């Protein structure tokens, strides 16, 4: 075989590898040796750090159960806002554009929505209002994404529609020290302004609100697989779940 032919074959194979990495189903992240959720407690926050292989955003009103012996979920909770209490599921009942398992749903949002989160190609990103191209990219790559109220972005507070004096329990998807994806929840009710400052004090650089109130239910697994429940509002009217998989 001529040398030029061999070189051409190598170039074609390399191009195929690059194209697959760019446009194939690439939702898997770096594989970890031990799948669990680590917990860090501060005076007023609970920081949950999933050791995961992949992430997805599921559109369904079926609550993922924590007692399945073959469950590959290590963390799950609601993420986007839900429009109405409905007994049947509809993507149109999820407020804002989202990507579920590589499927893009362009929907109208709310004035509360000021940012987004995407996960594809094994990497995550927090985004401000210019997120549509990244949503489309996540869909092309078999990834996921959702829109929500941005609380912190690149180490700075974001002006929010939610008032700083609103005093309830809060939860957010966060970027710790700009390197570690985590979920942060208050250890009880506190003013929203205090929550923002507490996130900054804990080293959070980016934070996207996660729905709470009547949609606060979720759970996570510790290092030996024991599920721990968070939130109490367990019902059949949920529309979406942020899921970390092992």
Residue ranges and their predicted role:
Residues 2-246:
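Gly/Ser/Thr/Pro-rich low-complexity, intrinsically disordered segments
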């Amino acid at each position: 075989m001529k040398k030029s032919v061999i070189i051409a074959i190598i170039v074609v194979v390399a191009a195929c590898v690059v194209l697959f990495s760019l446009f194939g189903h690439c939702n898997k992240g770096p594989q970890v040796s031990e799948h669990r959720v680590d917990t860090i407690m501060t005076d007023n926050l609970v920081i949950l750090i999933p050791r995961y292989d992949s992430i997805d955003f599921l559109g369904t009103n079926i609550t993922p159960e924590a007692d399945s012996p073959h469950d590959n979920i290590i963390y799950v909770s609601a993420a986007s806002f839900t429009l109405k209490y409905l007994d049947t599921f509809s993507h149109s009942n999820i407020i804002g554009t989202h990507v579920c398992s590589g499927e893009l749903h362009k929907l109208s949002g709310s004035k509360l929505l000021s940012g987004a989160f995407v996960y594809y190609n094994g990497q995550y990103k927090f985004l401000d209002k210019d997120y549509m191209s990244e949503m489309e990219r996540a869909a092309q790559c078999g990834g996921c994404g959702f829109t929500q109220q941005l609380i912190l972005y690149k180490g700075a507070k974001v002006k929010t529609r939610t008032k700083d004096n609103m005093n309830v329990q809060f939860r957010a998807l966060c970027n710790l020290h700009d390197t570690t994806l985590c979920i942060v929840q208050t250890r009880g009710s506190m003013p929203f302004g205090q929550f923002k400052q507490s996130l900054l004090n804990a080293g959070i650089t980016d934070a996207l609100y996660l729905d709470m109130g009547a949609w606060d239910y979720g759970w996570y697994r510790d290092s030996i697989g024991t599920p721990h429940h968070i939130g109490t509002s367990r019902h059949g009217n949920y529309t979406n779940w942020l899921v970390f998989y092992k």
